[in-house]
Amino acid sequence: MMNIVLARIDDRFIHGQILTRWIKVHAADRIIVVSDDIAQDEMRKTLILSVAPSNVKASAVSVSKMAKAFHSPRYEGVTAMLLFENPSDIVSLIEAGVPIKTVNVGGMRFENHRRQITKSVSVTEQDIKAFETLSDKGVKLELRQLPSDASEDFVQILRNVTK
């Protein structure tokens, strides 16, 4: 089985903080963007993967392909950082048999149909339900931009703003 060292929601995907901070702290040798939408959109996929450094393998795959790869002997010993666009994809991945115990909530951009709940996180009703599902499944949800930042309990933040 693959070794998942970080599961992070960050809709910027591969960017400076990922490349200079997170990847070093977790010593990942592979970055995997897990998104059904991006896996099917060749243009977005190419743009996202083009910024990965040459010393780190990067790929963008669907949720089902990630579940298969996780259990494949081919990826035994791979140390991977998983990047997600939203919490619903993580729920789907867990339900497909991939054990994720902690999710780092990094950034979800503001748009008109989203509610801003922190400086860096804006959510839809679907996102809120998915975060609640993750919490109900025992997944720890932490808000943290950088590895050096203090970890904040994202479930508590979500509860405080959605009362």
Curated annotation (Swiss-Prot):
Listed GO CC annotations: cytoplasm
Top EC class of this enzyme: transferase
Keywords of the record: Cytoplasm, Kinase, Phosphoprotein, Phosphotransferase system, Sugar transport, Transferase, Transport
Gene Ontology BP term (one): phosphoenolpyruvate-dependent sugar phosphotransferase system
Active site: 15
Function recorded in the entry: The phosphoenolpyruvate-dependent sugar phosphotransferase system (sugar PTS), a major carbohydrate active -transport system, catalyzes the phosphorylation of incoming sugar substrates concomitantly with their translocation across the cell membrane. The enzyme II LevDE PTS system is involved in fructose transport.
Listed Gene3D superfamilies: Phosphotransferase system, sorbose subfamily IIB component (3.40.35.10)
PROSITE patterns, per the entry: PTS_EIIB_TYPE_4 (PS51101)
Catalytic reactions on record: D-fructose(out) + N(pros)-phospho-L-histidyl-[protein] = D-fructose 1-phosphate(in) + L-histidyl-[protein]
Subcellular location: Cytoplasm
Domain comment quoted from the record: The PTS EIIB type-4 domain is phosphorylated by phospho-EIIA on a histidyl residue. Then, it transfers the phosphoryl group to the sugar substrate concomitantly with the sugar uptake processed by the PTS EIIC type-4 domain.
Chief location bin: cytoplasm
Cytoplasm recorded as keyword: yes
Species of origin: Bacillus subtilis (strain 168)
Keyword rRNA-binding tagged: no
Name of this chain's protein: PTS system fructose-specific EIIB component
Superkingdom of origin: Bacteria
Modified residues (Phosphohistidine): 15
Gene name of the encoded protein: levE
EC number: 2.7.1.202
Induction (record text): By fructose and LevR.
Domain PTS EIIB type-4 positions: 1-163
Molecular function (Gene Ontology), one example: kinase activity
Family annotation (Pfam families): PTSIIB_sorb (PF03830)
